[in-house]
A protein has these predicted regions:
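Short hydrophobic core segments
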Residues: 9, 122, 149-163, 194
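Glycine-rich dinucleotide-binding loop and its adjacent helix/turn
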Residues: 159-194
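Glycine-rich active-site loop/strand segments that organize a redox cofactor
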Residues: 36-99
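A conserved short coil-to-beta-strand element within the FAD-binding core of flavoproteins
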Residues: 118-136
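A structured beta-alpha segment of the ubiquitous adenosine-cofactor-binding alpha/beta core
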Residues: 115, 122-123, 142-148
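Extended hydrophobic secondary-structure segments that form protein cores and membrane-embedded regions
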Residues: 7-8, 32-40, 116-121, 156-157
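Helical element adjacent to the flavin cofactor pocket in flavoenzyme catalytic cores
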Residues: 98-117
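N-terminal Rossmann-like FAD-binding beta1-loop-alpha1 element of flavoenzymes
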Residues: 4-34, 194
Length: 194
């Protein structure tokens, strides 16, 4: 059997959504799928990582879903899980939605032998092809060792928002906060006298 090799780089909301669509395809068993993200964000993404329970999703829980066929799937998942219990679940913390997404990635990883989770940072992506060649192969590099580079037929770039642009070169300046996530560490280095 000839396998088509697929990479999904970035496993937050978009990456998990792409994987959910791929596994529904009748030929999914003929794919070899590698998914890339760091261990902290794998399956959750930055905005939905473990963080303060004060950060609520700005949509009612019953209206959230990654499933196009069931717009209450997140709510149903929340009702059936036992890890989280909030007294007013109409608006749940963002990290709970992250756990919902991560639960599907874990489920797919347990169900499918043709899915591989790779917790290495992607350092480079390149193609090698001749002019006018439409049969591209994508190379994903997570280290300098060429033997470790992986080749793919298709590539999904789902890494979300890049880090904030710093037009005033403030990064590294005392008091400047580059990113608010995770919020429970955002103010660690800010003193009352700042």
């Amino acid at each position: 059997m000839i396998y088509m090799r697929v990479a999904i780089i970035g496993m937050g909301t978009a990456g998990v959504s792409v994987l959910r669509q791929l596994v529904k395809h009748e030929n999914f068993s003929q794919l070899k799928v590698d998914v890339y993200d760091d261990d902290r964000n794998m399956g959750q993404g930055v905005p939905f990582q473990n963080d303060s329970s004060e950060l609520l999703i700005n949509m009612p829980s019953k209206s959230m879903s990654l499933n196009l066929d069931d717009d209450q799937e997140f709510w149903k998942w929340y009702q059936n899980q036992t890890e989280f219990n909030f007294s007013n679940p109409q608006y749940l913390p963002r990290f709970v939605f992250g756990h919902y997404m991560k639960s599907y990635l874990s489920y797919y990883n347990d169900q499918f032998d043709n899915l591989t989770i790779i917790n290495d940072k992607v350092q480079e992506i390149f193609t090698q092809s001749d002019v006018d060649d439409t049969d591209l192969k994508y190379h994903v590099c997570t280290c300098d060792d060429e033997k470790e580079w992986r080749e793919y037929d298709y590539l999904f770039l789902t890494f979300g928002t890049f880090s904030y642009h710093d037009p005033y070169d403030l990064k590294g300046t005392k008091g400047y906060i580059q990113t608010p996530y995770p919020t429970y560490h955002t103010l660690d280095n800010v003193k009352d006298s700042d």
